[in-house]
Structures are given as structure tokens and as C-alpha cells.
């Protein structure tokens, strides 16, 4: 166990403290990070030996939201935390992405990072705290890690960059940017923005990197004082002799195979070379079974090297495109008859079907997490079935990748979604990947725009997305537009940029090497903007404006305003009144605290009927207005007349007629319909009526 130590630094005007050596003695690295009143405990562990038979680094990252951190008791029967929320999964990915490239190549030991949220201050979001804590826990542990990394959130408030904006500033901010990196370079970018210009986004990323350097320097000081010596590791790599033999036999064949234009044919050709190579060495090597893993590793290295050489030295991509060339695009809308909006977006061999569904405001997603936000009106879900890549495997629920891609596409469209006041509908978009050869998340962005327009949703502008790639080889750099699957897998960067003609709405960047500098970032953003404008032009050829009318199968919504004090009258005891209206008309009714009432249904006649029933409940008598009422009670001094449902007024005996009325029953009886005028509503809300003011005055005879 370490000696108990506390380290502190000023981080954007608030104290960031790191406590080490107090808890979790068995973990390889452990710390508690506190930023204001947000507190996260991070622990990291590793397996003693490498995992056999794998060709990847088995890293797992879990961000655990504990509802006690915000003083809540979980709902449901069990009253305990269940599966991770969408926000927790996205934060786990935020932690994972910048640290994964910084482990040694060939490291096969299992590594786990667990960030547990202990306390949440809404002014200091715990995700950044967890990202910093994960870097610290790995850096002070004996696990080989080429960090540390720092992470920071940047907002744009009134034209100025704000580091780690508080809750009020986040509401005003036109950008939410999370950047992670080392002292030398940027490793990861995640952003949502309100059409922020490309130059401003670049400045924000570089501004964030300056803050990251301060955090890294702080962590380096902690490591110097309490860091453990790194463990000796066994890194997997093929032997020199077998490497040379495989390269001599397979390099030329594989080089030819990777230049096949069509994806499935290219994969078949590469598999054929692999089978030929394995068959050759099965005949020539005595202990062939011991070398299968090495042979496959060398073949993969050959593929990677040959693709990268072709791109960097010959400017030739696997499908023969130029570095900045976008694949052919075609779009179609309205192909699903009963859907409220639908579109297919195809770019090369990547194809996505997007379907838009409109619902009543009661269909919003209810959220129960660590944030103060309670519901979500606009949703985007992304599905990636096995058939989209020509595979056969069981269909499970959405994984972290699907949730991450769906959230990115959702964030890209959010700035152009009309407000509830402009368009009082819940909106759900579903992207079904039909064929995948790279950049499906950005195809989902494009498909979402098209299906929203097809549904008649008055979005503020069209949004398109593009994925950029990077190859650094032999000291040369190539930036690729609209990367396909192989370029993504074998490249050094996956940089997704979505936006309108005027600015960026979402960014997601992952770096597989030791980061990128300003020049490369600037070049990638410029190329991405050119590609985005081209894609928007292709999309406009299919549809460029929202349809003037909603689908006949979409619910119709009528909005009305009532006095908030009358909400209880509309709902009734135990919901009796509103349930009766819903049963009678078949509509949905959603009532806001402000008194806004949204009535939705397919048949407009039923909506109007529900509106009339609600009006009858909430309408107030007005002085000077005439009503046709029914006599409900008779007293010796007058009659009570129900002029509105549940609302009576007094018709005094002296106001029944111009002539003297000796007895009320001489003129009126219970149940009689009578036309009356409201003459007064006193300070206690009592209504006085008159019948005689509506009757012609009798003519007086001359004496």
C-alpha cells in the first residue's frame, strides 16, 4: 500500500485534488479524484499472464453511475442500479478511446479500468473527472502505459472559450467539446456544436490542448512521487525467420489482392492468399501448428504495410479513388408507405435506411440518471445487423458501438431540430445499416436529414457527415476523405465531422498513433468541409425542403393554453376526468406545468371534440357575455343557473323579468333552459346573472 498522499492543482478556477494510498490496496493503481464536489474513484487491474489465442489488446473500461452520488434511490422492484445507462456507456467510451493506443503493441494481458462515481456536483461533470482519474490510476500503476493523458471540456459562451463550464454556462454554450491528449499531441476529440465555424472549432481544440498540458504536468509530478515500477511484459510478435519466409512468399500476392475494387471480392482474394500461404507452410514446416499464429500476424502486417505504401507513395487507395474523392452517392425518400418519413442514403458500398416516427409529447424518453435532465424529446437509434457485412451471427441487443454511433448521429442533428414550441412532437429516428463499408455513422446522419425532410419536420438546415482518415508512413502523411472499412481498420485516424453548409454540429476523432498536430488537424477539417458541401449538394438533388404536410399516418397535434390553476380540474380526482375524455375521444393528452395542453390523435374531429370538452371544464364566465344555461336550483330569492359545466350563477328574482315576479316558479322550473347575461363577478368569484336585460322592455301606456 502506498503512503497516503493528497495532490492538488488549480483547474479552471476550481481545486482538483487527487488522493492516493488510502483505499483499494489490491488494485494495481487506485485514486480518488475530487473536483469541487464531484468525486470519482478509479481502480485499474491487470491479469498476471497474457491471454492466449487472441490478436487484440483485451482492455475493458467501466464507468459506474451510483445514484447515491446524487441522493437518489433507484426505482424498480429491486431498488438497486441495473445495467449501465446510455450516458454511462458513452462515458466509458470517452475514457477508453484516448488511453487504448498508449499501451504497447503486442501487449495481451487483460487490463480493466473501473471508474465509480461517488458524488456529483452538477457544475463539475464527473465524466472529465473520471477521464483524468483513469489516466492517473494507470500512470501510477505497474501496468505498461505510455501516458499520462489529460482531458478537458471546453464551451463557447458569448464568443469566448470556457474551460469546464458550469451548469449555467453549459445552457448558454454553443459548443460542448471534450478533448483528451498527451503533452505532445491530441488523442481524442468529441464535440456537439451549434453550427460552429471550422476555424473556431480548430481554435477550441488547440485551446483545450494547452489546458491538457497543465494536467499532464500535474500527473507527471504524482507519478514521480508515488508511481510504481512498470512490470516486465511479454509482447507478442512473430519470429524473424518465419517473418522473412512469409514475406517472401506472400507479399506480391497480397499487394495485388488488396487493390481489388469491390469489398467482398477483395476480402475473398485476401482470404485466398492467406489460405495459399497456410497451405504452403503446412507442407514445408515441420511444426506448422506452432507457427499458425505467427503466419497470420505477418500476413496482417503485410496487408497494413502494402495499403499504407500505396496510399502514401502512389496516392492510390484500395478502390482506386483519389485521396479527396467521395464515393458515388444516391438517395431515395418515401419508400416505406406507412412510415411518417423514410430515406435510403447510399455512399459506395455503405447503405443506411433511416425511418422517422413522430409521436405525442407523452412518448418522450424518460431519463433517470445522474443528470438533472428528465426526458428526451428527440432520439436516434442505430442498428448494425450482421448481414450488413455479409456475416451470420445471432442478433443481440445494441452494443457499445451501436449506442456510440447512435449518440453521434443524434448529436449531429440536434441543433437543427425545431423547438417544442415550433413543432410539438416527439421524434424518433432509427438507422438500419443495410450494407457497411466504412462511415456508417455519417451515412446515418445524412439519412436522418433526408427522412426528417420526408416526414415534414421543419428542420433549420440540412446536415451531412463525412469520415476522414489518416495514414502516416515513412515520414509522409496522407489525409483521406470518406474512408472505407479497410482504410479505417488499417489507418491511423478516424475523424468524423458532421455539420451544415455553415458550420460543424458534431465531431468524433480517434487516433491510433501517438496523436496528431495542428497542421494535420487543420488539413483534415478543411478537407472534411469540402466533402460535406459536396455531399449536401448530392442530397439536395433528392429533397431539399420539408414536405408541406405531415404523413396522413402521423398523429395530428393541437395545442391549447389553460390556466395552470385549472390543471387539477382537467385531470380530476384520481385522473377520472382526463381518462373519461381520452376514452371518449381516443386521443392522447399531455399537460405541461405551464398550462400548455397538447392533444394528439389521428382523427382531427376527435381532437376537436377533446378540445371542446377541456374548454368546457376550464372556461371562465365573462362579464357582459350571454350564456344559454339550465336551471339547477330554485330558492325563494332567485334561481341558480348552470351556465358552464360545473359553474353556476345566481339569477336574482328581481332580474328574471321586467315586471314584478312574486314567485320564481311562476316563470322558471328546475331543468328549464334559459338565456342569461353575466352582469357581475364579485371579488369572491360569485357570478350574478340577468335575464331581463335580454328581454324587450314593455311599452308604458299614456295616462
Swiss-Prot record:
Q: Which PANTHER family match?
A: POLYRIBONUCLEOTIDE NUCLEOTIDYLTRANSFERASE, POLYRIBONUCLEOTIDE NUCLEOTIDYLTRANSFERASE 1, MITOCHONDRIAL
User: CDD domains attached here?
Assistant: KH-I_PNPase (cd02393), RNase_PH_PNPase_1 (cd11363), RNase_PH_PNPase_2 (cd11364), S1_PNPase (cd04472)
**Where is it localised?**
Cytoplasm
Keywords (alphabetical) are:
Cytoplasm, Magnesium, Metal-binding, Nucleotidyltransferase, RNA-binding, Transferase
Q: Where is the KH domain?
A: 555-614
**Residue stretches making up the S1 motif domain:** 624-692
* Molecular-function GO terms, alphabetical: 3'-5'-RNA exonuclease activity; magnesium ion binding; polyribonucleotide nucleotidyltransferase activity; RNA binding
Q: What is its EC number?
A: 2.7.7.8
Q: Cofactors per UniProt? A: Mg(2+)
- Per the record, what are the reactions this protein catalyses? RNA(n+1) + phosphate = RNA(n) + a ribonucleoside 5'-diphosphate
Protein function? Involved in mRNA degradation. Catalyzes the phosphorolysis of single-stranded polyribonucleotides processively in the 3'- to 5'-direction.
Q: What family is it from?
A: Belongs to the polyribonucleotide nucleotidyltransferase family.
Residues noted as binding Mg(2+) in the record, renumbered to the chain: 488, 494
Q: Matching PROSITE patterns, A to Z?
A: KH_TYPE_1 (PS50084), S1 (PS50126)
Protein's GO biological process = mRNA catabolic process; RNA processing
In its UniProt entry, what is this protein called? Polyribonucleotide nucleotidyltransferase
- Annotated organism of origin: Clostridioides difficile (strain 630)
Matching Pfam families:
KH_1, PNPase, RNase_PH, RNase_PH_C, S1
Query: Taxonomic classification, please?
Result: Bacteria, Bacillati, Bacillota, Clostridia, Peptostreptococcales
Domain of life assignment: Bacteria
An annotated GO cellular component = cytosol
Amino acid at each position: 500500500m502506498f503512503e497516503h498522499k493528497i495532490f492538488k492543482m488549480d483547474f479552471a478556477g476550481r481545486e482538483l485534488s487527487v488522493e492516493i494510498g488510502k483505499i483499494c490496496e489490491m488494485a494495481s493503481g487506485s485514486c480518488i479524484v475530487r473536483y469541487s464536489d464531484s468525486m470519482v474513484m478509479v481502480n485499474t487491474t491487470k491479469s498476471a499472464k497474457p491471454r492466449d489465442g487472441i490478436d487484440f489488446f483485451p482492455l475493458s473500461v467501466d464507468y459506474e453511475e451510483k445514484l447515491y452520488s446524487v441522493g437518489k434511490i433507484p426505482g424498480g422492484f429491486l431498488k438497486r442500479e441495473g445495467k449501465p445507462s446510455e450516458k454511462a456507456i458513452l462515458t466509458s467510451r470517452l475514457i477508453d478511446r484516448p488511453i487504448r493506443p498508449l499501451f504497447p503493441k503486442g501487449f495481451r494481458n487483460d487490463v480493466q479500468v473501473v471508474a465509480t462515481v461517488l458524488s456529483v456536483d452538477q457544475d463539475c461533470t464527473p465524466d472529465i473527472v473520471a477521464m483524468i482519474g483513469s489516466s492517473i490510476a494507470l500512470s501510477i500503476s505497474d501496468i505498461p502505459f505510455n501516458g499520462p493523458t489529460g482531458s478537458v471540456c471546453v464551451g463557447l459562451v458569448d464568443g469566448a472559450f470556457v474551460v469546464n463550464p458550469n451548469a449555467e454556462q453549459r445552457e448558454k454554450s454553443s459548443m460542448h467539446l471534450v478533448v483528451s491528449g498527451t503533452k505532445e499531441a491530441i488523442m481524442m476529440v468529441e464535440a456537439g456544436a451549434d453550427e460552429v465555424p471550422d476555424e473556431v472549432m480548430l481554435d477550441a481544440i488547440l485551446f483545450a490542448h494547452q489546458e491538457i498540458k497543465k494536467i499532464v504536468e500535474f500527473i507527471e509530478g504524482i507519478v514521480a512521487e508515488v508511481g510504481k515500477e512498470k512490470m516486465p511484459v511479454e509482447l507478442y510478435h512473430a519470429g524473424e525467420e518465419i517473418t522473412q519466409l512469409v514475406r517472401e512468399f506472400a507479399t506480391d500476392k497480397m499487394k495485388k489482392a488488396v487493390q481489388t475494387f469491390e469489398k467482398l471480392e477483395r476480402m475473398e482474394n485476401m482470404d485466398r492468399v492467406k489460405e495459399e500461404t497456410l497451405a504452403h507452410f503446412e507442407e514445408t514446416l515441420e511444426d506448422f501448428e506452432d507457427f499458425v499464429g505467427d503466419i497470420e500476424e505477418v500476413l496482417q502486417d503485410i496487408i497494413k504495410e502494402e495499403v499504407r505504401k500505396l496510399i502514401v507513395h502512389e496516392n492510390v487507395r484500395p478502390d482506386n479513388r483519389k485521396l479527396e474523392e467521395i464515393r458515388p452517392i444516391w438517395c431515395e425518400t418515401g419508400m416505406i408507405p406507412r412510415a411518417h418519413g423514410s430515406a435510403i442514403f447510399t455512399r459506395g458500398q455503405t447503405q443506411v435506411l433511416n425511418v422517422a416516427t413522430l409521436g405525442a409529447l407523452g412518448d418522450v424518453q424518460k431519463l433517470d440518471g445522474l443528470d438533472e435532465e428528465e426526458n428526451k424529446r428527440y432520439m436516434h437509434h442505430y442498428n448494425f445487423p450482421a448481414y450488413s457485412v455479409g456475416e451470420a451471427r445471432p442478433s443481440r441487443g445494441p452494443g457499445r458501438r451501436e449506442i456510440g454511433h447512435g449518440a453521434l448521429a443524434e448529436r449531429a442533428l440536434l441543433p437543427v431540430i425545431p423547438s417544442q414550441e415550433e413543432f410539438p412532437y416527439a421524434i424518433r429516428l432509427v438507422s438500419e445499416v443495410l450494407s457497411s463499408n466504412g462511415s456508417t455513422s455519417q451515412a446515418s446522419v445524412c439519412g436522418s436529414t433526408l427522412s426528417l425532410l420526408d416526414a415534414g419536420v421543419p428542420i433549420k438546415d440540412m446536415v451531412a457527415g463525412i469520415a476522414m482518415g489518416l495514414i502516416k508512413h515513412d515520414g509522409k502523411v496522407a489525409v483521406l476523405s470518406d474512408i472505407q472499412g479497410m482504410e479505417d481498420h488499417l489507418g491511423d485516424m478516424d475523424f468524423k465531422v458532421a455539420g451544415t453548409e455553415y458550420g460543424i454540429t458534431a465531431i468524433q476523432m480517434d487516433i491510433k498513433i501517438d496523436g496528431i498536430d495542428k497542421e494535420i488537424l487543420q488539413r483534415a477539417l478543411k478537407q472534411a468541409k469540402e466533402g460535406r458541401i459536396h455531399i449536401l449538394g448530392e442530397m439536395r438533388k433528392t429533397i431539399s425542403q420539408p414536405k408541406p404536410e405531415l404523413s396522413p399516418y402521423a398523429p395530428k397535434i393541437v395545442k391549447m393554453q389553460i390556466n395552470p390553476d385549472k390543471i387539477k380540474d382537467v385531470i380530476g380526482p384520481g385522473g377520472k376526468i382526463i381518462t373519461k375524455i381520452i376514452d371518449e375521444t381516443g386521443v392522447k393528452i399531455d399537460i405541461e406545468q405551464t398550462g400548455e395542453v397538447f392533444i394528439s390523435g389521428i382523427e382531427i374531429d376527435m381532437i376537436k371534440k377533446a378540445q371542446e370538452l377541456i374548454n368546457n371544464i376550464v372556461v371562465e364566465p365573462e362579464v357582459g357575455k350571454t350564456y344559454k344555461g339550465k336551471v339547477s336550483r330554485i330558492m325563494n330569492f332567485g334561481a341558480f343557473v348552470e351556465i358552464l359545466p360545473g359553474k353556476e350563477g345566481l339569477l336574482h328574482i328581481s332580474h328574471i323579468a321586467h315586471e314584478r315576479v312574486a314567485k320564481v316558479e311562476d316563470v322558471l322550473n328546475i331543468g328549464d333552459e334559459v338565456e342569461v347575461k353575466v352582469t357581475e363577478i364579485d371579488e369572491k368569484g360569485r357570478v350574478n346573472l340577468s335575464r331581463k336585460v335580454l328581454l324587450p322592455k314593455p311599452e308604458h301606456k299614456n295616462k
